[in-house]
Amino acid sequence: MKILATIVLAGALAACPSSPDCEVCPAMGNACVPPGACTPASCQRPIVSSALPNEQVQYLGTHKVGTELPFTVPADAGSVSIVQQAKVAGLSVIYKNQVLDNSAVPLTITFPDGGIAYDDNDPALAAALKDSPDGGSDLSRFYTVYGGDTPNTAAFTFPNTTSSLDSGVPEGTWKFVVNDYANECTLISGCSDGGSADSMYDVSVITRTQPQGSSLDVAFYIVADVTNPSGAPLRAPNASTDQSVQRMVQSFQSMFAQVGITANVKFYDVDASARARFGTNLNVTNTGPCEEMNQMFTLSSANVGNFMNLFLVQGLSSSDSTGSFLVVGIDGTIPGPSSFNGTVQSGAVISIADLYFRTSTASCAGAVDIVNCGADSVAHIAAHESGHFLGLFHTTEREGAAFDPLTDTPKCPCLTCSSAADRPQCGTANPRIGASRCLSLSCGGGDNLMFWLLAPGEKLSTQQGQVMRLNPLVH
């Protein structure tokens, strides 16, 4: 193997000996790649195939950014997912003095009639995405929207707005332009580093036919090295008899049942080295493809199938955890790459620090109670992160200035709903709109499962349910 590597390396060096714009990358098969695209050998960025039947998957091959590709949408389509997996791509760009992950997102998506379904540089969409502490921003009128932060492996799934839910997905030949932020840095001003028109992506398009689905297969990976109250290590074989785990599963299932989805749950173990590496205080401050969380998600390759992968760890470490605010769950991307197991974005991570907490023996016996029953709290976190993976955004973000693109989820805008003490801070990053401020007709959404803060209330709206049931993960 050492001799073979030397021969391959020599061949790669011969391919680009004089170009200052490329480097040989051992971690990517000794390919000649743009600077910044080569990552350490310990960073796995696998390209995988969809687990869905061939009739749902259009594999379009590997293409350079800037390439416009056609794809076909059948007459009975309910949703479309455009999936880009980096073959060669840098990790970050610097835009207006901010370091951003090099996210993959279609530059444009074109309807069969030639109209534009999505334009990543649409000024009207950019204006609507700006902070709106008065609640005046309305993303629901756009056919589809993009939430950002989808480096390396990205799914762009629609419908995800009221407009696209109402109008559906027209039959015919669509087009989209392969793209990432590095490519856009060559097209717009404001980028000081990371721009490149040489990124290459493996591209697939998933079409999910009507009717909407009603079943979701969920894989819980026990990464945390914890013991149950009897002193036994929590592992997949004893999860089915663990009272707290089963309470968590029942509550999780009830949250999906309200929108007509049956959650079928399985538990899997990981090996001791994975538990030691990822299981305790997993750092999620950064979530690029080479970070620990994203590398953990590649463990889902062990089980082939169309799963919602949820990784259970003892706790999360994040710079966003300050004072009484703790990060307890995080998704790879919104939405996730449904049916693509084993990528750096194939799942969500959940803290089970409170799994065995209860204020009394009766706390976990009745209705869902995330305050007094730790298993219910874990269920809420898991369902919330699954909602993100299926395409749902927060109903209201923590500053009370950004809202989801659905008309039947109430807003809680800062200028109307924050406390008198917080109101002068509206329009900055300082206010945090608590759920208690968002429980009225004019200031709502605090009891929705997708509110930004873990708080009592697991409601899901009709349109949220539609987005979830149209995702290719739900069958």
Task: For the regions a language model picked out, list residue spans one by one.
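Fold-level signature of zinc-dependent metallopeptidase catalytic domains
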Residues: 184-187, 191-284, 313-317, 326
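Active-site-proximal segments of metallohydrolase catalytic domains
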Residues: 262-372
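Bacterial Sec-dependent N-terminal signal peptides
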Residues: 15-52
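Noncatalytic accessory or regulatory domains flanking protease catalytic cores in secreted, cell-surface
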Residues: 63-71, 108-195
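Hydrophobic helical h-region of N-terminal Sec-dependent signal peptides
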Residues: 5-13
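Short, surface-exposed beta-strand/strand-loop-strand elements in extracellular ectodomains
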Residues: 92-118
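The catalytic-center signature of Zn2+-dependent metalloproteases
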Residues: 278, 363-466
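Non-catalytic, beta-strand-enriched accessory regions in extracellular/secretory proteins
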Residues: 48-83, 88-97
